[in-house]
Design a protein with these regions (language model features):
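Tight coil/turn sites that cap or link beta-strands
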Residues: 153, 229-231, 239, 326-329, ...
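Glycine- and acidic-residue-biased ligand/ion/polar-headgroup-sensing regions
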Residues: 142-144, 168-169, 173-202, 239, ...
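Loop-centered beta-sheet repeat module
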Residues: 206-259
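Transition-metal
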Residues: 2-6, 11, 15-193, 258-297, ...
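Non-heme Fe(II)/2-oxoglutarate
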Residues: 238-242, 246-271, 298-301, 336-337, ...
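Ligand-binding loop in jelly-roll beta-barrel domains
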Residues: 140-145, 176-179, 232-251, 371-398
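Acidic/His-leaning functional-site neighborhoods
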Residues: 295-365
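Short acidic-glycine-tyrosine-enriched beta hairpin
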Residues: 215-226, 353-372
Length: 401
């Protein structure tokens, strides 16, 4: 965890209106790029009224897979695997500004400091400069299971880590093969003390745990949607590509069992068994898991142009998810709410905003439509294939716990 980010971001906010010249220093000395402060602020404001996609980054991992290497252009093919793509984890992402073929990167924070009300709309005073929703990929294709883990309860993350809200997440199965699964919720006969003893003994003795004695294993298929509110035991199995949609407080995950494997550095990855035990809801077990933690989508609207489905999230989630299926085009209104979108089936779309700006977005690319965009059109660029798009947004009248 990088404490300097928090300190320097406060300074960055104060500096934004005073900047005369901003330099992108990620290049050789004779290739540095710069932008005037006025152009920077104008570009950010324009972005806040139309659309944006952050620059994602990709990272290998102990359980990483091969799907992203084979499906996303421009990635390093020499790495053994890719485990994560932080598609929209704004503490890690930058924004690219282009002029005359040159691309300059600035911190995402600048956009929120410049125009957070345009970005977030009706929930802007709830979240202020903290962008609330995160999209990322977990790739276990030809890889391995994720660690068995959970996320902190709201009060716990506030008291122990000084974060404004916690990570309530979901798994959307973008792709899968063979016999994919998701580990989610406890078996009906779970005994917390036995679970803790077994995990701690495994950590001390490096012995395997028969995890299905304690944790349910659910078969998964493409476009399934699993709900993982804070305090829920969970993990993705191998041979999945998971679009993880979650709230975005940063990196507070309590790993409790990691299959007795080594990290990329050849050492066991750190576990946080006691933190996990302090936060788990052991009542999320048995049939309750199927009823409350596996989403049951339903059709909200269906006509010749489009099918709109609601993918209800858990009551703990402050965001909701809709899914749109269409072949030609659809018109959207933001209703003063920020939309975070991804094409989960199809080739590409063209987004055209009320202000007349246009941009192509491809399959599996995350893009954001700010609340201030008001209305926009999504046009399928290959009508021979249908488009399936998921949209996440903050629920009405949200208050943070």
């Amino acid at each position: 965890y990088f404490v300097d980010w928090i300190v320097l971001n406060k300074h960055k906010k104060q500096c934004l209106p005073l900047i005369d010249l901003l330099i992108d220093g990620q290049r050789e000395w004779d290739e540095l790029l710069m932008i005037s402060g006025n152009d920077l602020r104008e570009g950010l404001h324009k972005m806040s009224r139309n659309f944006f996609r952050v620059r994602p980054w990709f990272e290998p991992g102990a359980w990483g897979g091969q799907w992203m290497k084979n499906h996303i252009q421009g990635l390093n093919k020499e790495v053994n695997n890719l485990a994560w793509s932080f598609e929209l984890m704004v503490l890690e992402n930058g924004l690219m500004l282009e002029s005359d073929g040159y691309r300059l990167e600035v911190s995402f924070d600048f956009l929120m400091y410049s125009d957070y009300q345009n970005i977030l709309g009706e929930c802007s005073e709830t979240f202020k400069y903290d962008f609330p929703i995160r999209f990322d990929f977990l790739d276990t294709f030809d890889g391995d299971n994720l660690s068995i883990q959970c996320h902190p309860r709201p009060r716990y993350i506030q008291e122990h880590f000084n974060m404004p809200f916690t990570q309530d997440e979901t798994y959307y199965i973008l792709d899968c093969k063979n016999s994919p699964c998701v580990y989610l919720g406890f078996q009906d006969n779970i005994v917390p003390e036995e679970f803790q003893y077994t995990l701690e003994r495994s950590q001390q003795k490096a012995t395997k745990v028969e995890i299905e004695r304690f944790v349910q294993k659910h078969q998964a298929k493409k476009h399934d949607f699993f709900l993982i509110p804070n305090g829920t035991i969970h993990a993705s199995g191998k041979d999945c590509v998971v679009l993880e949609i979650s709230s975005a407080p940063y990196i507070f995950t309590f790993k409790m069992y990691d299959w007795i494997r080594m990290g990329l550095d050849g050492k066991p990855r750190p576990l946080n068994i006691q933190h996990g035990m302090n936060n788990l809801y052991f009542e999320r077990k048995g049939e309750k898991v199927i009823q409350e933690l596996i989403c049951h989508p339903y059709i909200m609207k269906e006509n010749q142009e489009c099918t709109i489905e609601h993918l209800p999230t858990h009551k703990e989630h402050f965001y909701d998810v809709y899914r749109y299926t269409f072949k030609d085009r659809i018109q959207m209104n933001t209703e003063n709410t920020c939309h975070v979108c991804m094409i989960v089936e199809g080739d590409s779309v063209c987004i055209e905003t009320e202000d007349g700006m246009k941009q192509r977005f491809n399959y599996a690319e995350t893009f954001v439509i700010p609340a201030a965009a008001r209305s926009y059109t999504i046009i399928n660029e290959n009508p021979d294939k249908r488009i399936m798009l998921v949209k996440a947004f903050v629920k009405k009248e949200v208050t943070l716990k």
